[in-house]
């Protein structure tokens, strides 16, 4: 079964009349064939050609405009079979996939991986507690390094007005 944009659109309309929560979005993907664990947050519609080939384990955040591509039709150009290449995508426990990232077929991510925004993940990562980013994605750091660098700058959205009005040094500068 394909997850169509129209189906998602109708789902979102229905959702406006019920209590909004991320679990209902996850349920939409479960019904479509994606294996979705518990306590996940999926922020937006994710186009998935073959939902049965995707697994998102527990406690993950999938940001908006993420693409999970489970096939590659380009093989059709170099063979006369008219076929595709297919592969599973597995996102481990407690992973964060940044906005506009793409994960290609055959990729498995270990637990506790942060995928930087805009990354293109073309190969699997079996090491846990790392940060990957880029095109193609590569390891750029560890959770501990990330925590040490940014822990003092971490804030809740409810604190943002106070930061803007007074503690501007708490904002991240690159």
Language model: regions and residue ranges:
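Short-chain dehydrogenase/reductase
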Residues: 96, 114, 131-133
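Conserved metal-binding segment of the jelly-roll/cupin
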Residues: 100, 115-118
């Amino acid at each position: 079964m394909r997850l169509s944009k129209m189906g998602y659109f109708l789902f979102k309309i229905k959702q406006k009349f019920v209590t909004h929560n991320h679990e209902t979005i996850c349920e939409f993907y479960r019904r479509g064939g994606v294996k979705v664990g518990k306590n996940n947050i999926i922020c937006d519609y994710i186009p998935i050609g073959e939902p049965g080939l995707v697994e998102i384990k527990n406690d993950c955040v999938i940001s908006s405009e993420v693409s999970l591509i489970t096939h590659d039709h380009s093989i059709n150009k170099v063979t006369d079979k008219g076929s595709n290449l297919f592969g599973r995508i597995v996102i481990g426990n407690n992973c964060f996939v940044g906005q506009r990232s793409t994960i290609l077929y055959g990729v498995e991510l270990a637990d506790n991986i942060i995928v930087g925004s805009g990354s293109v993940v073309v190969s699997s990562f079996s090491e846990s507690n790392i940060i990957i980013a880029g095109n193609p994605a590569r390891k750029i750091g560890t959770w501990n390094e990330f925590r040490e660098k940014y822990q003092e700058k971490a804030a809740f959205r409810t604190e943002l007005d106070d930061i803007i009005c007074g503690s501007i040094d708490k904002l991240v500068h690159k």
